[in-house]
C-alpha cells in the first residue's frame, strides 16, 4: 500500500511539472499542453493535469520554484471526471464544470502533493496487472484542488472580466464502492425522550443510598464532644469519662497524647494524665488520699459525697459489702450503707410484730399503715379479736378501743356490760 501511494505521488508530481513546464515563456506552443501518460487498464481514472485556460498570465513563484507563463488564447479542453469523493478536503476539480474555463493550470500544480497530516478514505492503489502507463493517481490527496482552492473559478470570481460569470458547479459523478466497507456504528439514543431506564434506576439507587446513610447517621449519633464541640457518630468514636462525652481521639493524655479510652487516667487540675505520666512526673505528690484508709490513691479513684476512696475501701458499714457500682445511702453521720441494711437499721418498726417495715422484693417504695400514730405492716393491720383484715372499705374499717385494733362488731361486743372477753393471743414466729 505504501509503495502504491508513493508511486501515485511521484506520478502526480511528474504530471504537474510537465504542465508547468509547458506554460513557461518561450515555449514553442504556449497554448497547448502535453498529454500525460495513459493510465493502465486496471487503474482508476486520473484527472487531466495539463489544462489550458484563459486569463492574464504573470510570473508567479510556485511551490516547486517554477514561474507561470502566459496562457494561450485557446480554451482548454474539459478535463475528465475523477471518481473521487466530493467531501474530501482535497477533492478533484473534475466536480466543477468551469474548471477548464476559469481555472489556472498553475494553481493545479500548486495543489498537487501528498499531505501526510490528513487521512483519506481511499488510497491510490496500483493494479497488480502490468500496464503500459504509470500508476493511476486515484487518491483524493494527490488530485487537483477543490472548488475552494486557488485554481477554482469561484475563488477568482472578482477577477473575471465584465460580463463573464463562472459556470455553475456540476455535481460529481457517484463514486464507486469503497474498497473496504466501514462498519455501521450504532448511534446513542437521543435525549428527546428523557433519561433512559438505566439512568432512572441509578438515580433511584442513589436516593435510596442517601436515605440509608441519613438513617444510619441519626441512629449512631451519641452527642457533642465536650472538648472539640463536634458531633460524635459511631460507638467506636465515643468515649465517656468524668460524666462527659468525648471523641476517642479527643480524650488523650495531656502529657504524651496517648488515647485514654479503656485505660486508667488521673485528673489533676482539670487535666487528665495516663498512669505512667502521673506516677513518674511528680503528680503523685498532689494525689488524693482515701477517706477510709488515709493512703494515697495512685490507681483507680472513686469519688462520692465529696470525698475520695479506693474502690476496695468503699464498703457498707453493716455487711462490709463493696459498693463500687452498687446503689448506696448514708445516714446523718455519713456512714455508708447498702440499701438493704439501711432499711433494716432505719426502717420503722411494726407496732404489731415489732419487725422493720421493708420494701417488697424488687421495689424501692415502703408501704405501711399508720393508725393511732403507730406503723403496721399491711398484713398486720387486722382485728385483734376476730382477725378480720382491716382497710378503708365499708365493713372493714378499724374501730380502735383502748389501743386495740378492732372491727365494728368486736368493738360493740367489748362495749356491752359484763365481763370483758379475754384478749386474743397472737403467736409470732421469730
UniProtKB/Swiss-Prot annotation:
Highest rank taxon of the organism: Eukaryota
Pro residues: bias regions: 164-189
Record keywords, A-Z: Cell junction, Cilium biogenesis/degradation, Cytoplasm, LIM domain, Metal-binding, Nucleus, Repeat, Repressor, RNA-mediated gene silencing, Transcription, Transcription regulation, Zinc
Protein name: Wilms tumor protein 1-interacting protein
Record-linked Pfam families: LIM
Gene Ontology MF annotations: metal ion binding; transcription corepressor activity
GO cellular component: adherens junction; nucleus; P-body; transcription regulator complex
Localization per Swiss-Prot or TrEMBL: Cell junction, Adherens junction; Nucleus; Cytoplasm, P-body
Main location: other
Family affiliation: Belongs to the zyxin/ajuba family.
Function summary: Adapter or scaffold protein which participates in the assembly of numerous protein complexes and is involved in several cellular processes such as cell fate determination, cytoskeletal organization, repression of gene transcription, cell-cell adhesion, cell differentiation, proliferation and migration. Positively regulates microRNA (miRNA)-mediated gene silencing. Negatively regulates Hippo signaling pathway and antagonizes phosphorylation of YAP1. Acts as a transcriptional corepressor for SNAI1 and SNAI2/SLUG-dependent repression of E-cadherin transcription.
Amino acid composition bias (Low complexity), ranges on this chain: 136-149
Subunit organization: Forms homodimers. Interacts with CD2AP and WT1. Interacts (via LIM domains) with SNAI1 (via SNAG domain), SNAI2/SLUG (via SNAG domain) and SCRT1 (via SNAG domain). Interacts with EIF4E, AGO1, AGO2, DCP2, DDX6, LATS1, LATS2, SAV1, EGLN2/PHD1 and EGLN3/PHD3. Interacts (via LIM domains) with isoform 1 and isoform 3 of VHL. Interacts with ROR2. Following treatment with bacterial lipopolysaccharide (LPS), forms a complex with MAPK8IP3 and dynein intermediate chain. Interacts with PRICKLE3.
GO BP term, example: miRNA-mediated post-transcriptional gene silencing
Span of domain LIM zinc-binding: 223-284, 288-348, 349-417
Region described as Disordered: 22-149, 164-198
InterPro entries (alphabetical): Ajuba-like, Ajuba-like_LIM1, Ajuba-like_LIM2, Ajuba-like_LIM3, Znf_LIM
Amino acid at each position: 500500500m505504501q509503495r502504491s501511494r508513493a508511486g501515485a505521488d511521484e506520478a502526480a508530481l511528474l504530471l504537474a511539472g510537465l504542465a508547468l513546464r509547458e506554460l513557461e515563456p518561450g515555449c514553442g506552443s504556449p497554448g497547448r499542453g502535453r498529454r500525460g501518460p495513459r493510465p493502465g487498464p486496471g487503474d482508476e481514472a486520473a484527472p487531466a493535469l495539463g489544462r489550458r485556460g484563459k486569463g492574464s498570465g504573470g510570473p508567479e513563484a510556485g511551490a516547486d520554484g517554477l514561474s507561470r507563463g502566459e496562457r494561450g488564447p485557446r480554451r482548454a479542453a474539459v478535463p475528465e471526471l475523477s471518481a473521487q469523493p466530493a467531501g474530501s478536503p482535497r477533492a478533484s476539480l473534475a466536480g466543477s464544470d468551469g474548471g477548464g474555463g476559469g481555472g489556472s493550470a498553475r494553481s493545479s500544480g500548486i495543489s498537487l502533493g501528498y499531505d501526510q497530516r490528513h487521512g483519506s478514505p481511499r488510497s491510490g492503489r496500483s493494479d497488480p496487472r502490468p500496464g503500459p502507463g504509470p500508476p493511476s493517481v486515484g487518491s483524493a490527496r494527490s488530485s487537483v484542488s477543490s472548488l475552494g482552492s486557488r485554481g477554482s473559478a469561484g475563488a477568482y470570481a472578482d477577477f473575471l472580466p465584465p460580463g463573464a460569470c463562472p459556470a455553475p458547479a456540476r455535481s460529481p459523478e457517484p463514486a464507486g464502492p469503497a474498497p473496504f466497507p466501514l462498519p455501521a456504528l450504532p448511534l446513542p439514543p437521543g435525549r428527546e425522550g428523557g433519561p433512559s431506564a438505566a439512568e432512572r434506576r441509578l438515580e433511584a439507587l442513589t436516593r435510596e443510598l442517601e436515605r440509608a446513610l441519613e438513617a444510619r447517621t441519626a441512629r449512631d449519633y451519641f452527642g457533642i464532644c465536650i472538648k472539640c464541640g463536634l458531633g460524635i457518630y459511631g460507638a467506636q468514636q465515643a468515649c465517656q469519662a468524668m460524666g462527659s462525652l468525648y471523641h476517642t481521639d479527643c480524650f488523650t493524655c495531656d502529657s504524651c497524647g496517648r488515647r485514654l479510652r479503656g485505660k486508667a487516667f488521673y485528673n489533676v487540675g482539670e487535666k487528665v494524665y495516663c498512669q505512667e505520666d502521673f506516677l513518674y512526673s511528680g503528680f503523685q505528690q498532689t494525689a488524693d488520699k482515701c477517706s477510709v484508709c488515709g493512703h494515697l490513691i495512685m490507681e483507680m479513684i472513686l469519688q462520692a459525697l465529696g470525698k475520695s476512696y479506693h474502690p476496695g475501701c468503699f464498703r457498707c458499714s453493716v455487711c462490709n459489702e463493696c459498693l463500687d457500682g452498687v446503689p448506696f445511702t448514708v445516714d446523718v453521720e455519713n456512714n455508708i450503707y447498702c440499701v438493704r441494711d439501711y432499711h433494716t437499721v432505719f426502717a420503722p418498726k411494726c407496732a404489731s410484730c415489732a419487725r422493720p417495715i421493708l420494701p417488697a422484693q424488687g421495689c424501692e417504695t415502703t408501704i405501711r399503715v399508720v393508725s393511732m400514730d403507730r406503723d403496721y405492716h399491711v398484713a398486720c393491720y387486722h382485728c385483734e379479736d376476730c382477725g378480720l383484715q382491716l382497710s378503708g372499705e365499708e365493713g372493714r374499717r378499724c374501730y380502735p378501743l383502748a389501743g386495740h385494733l378492732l372491727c365494728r362488731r368486736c368493738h360493740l361486743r367489748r362495749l356491752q356490760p359484763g365481763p370483758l372477753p379475754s384478749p386474743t393471743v397472737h403467736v409470732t414466729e421469730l
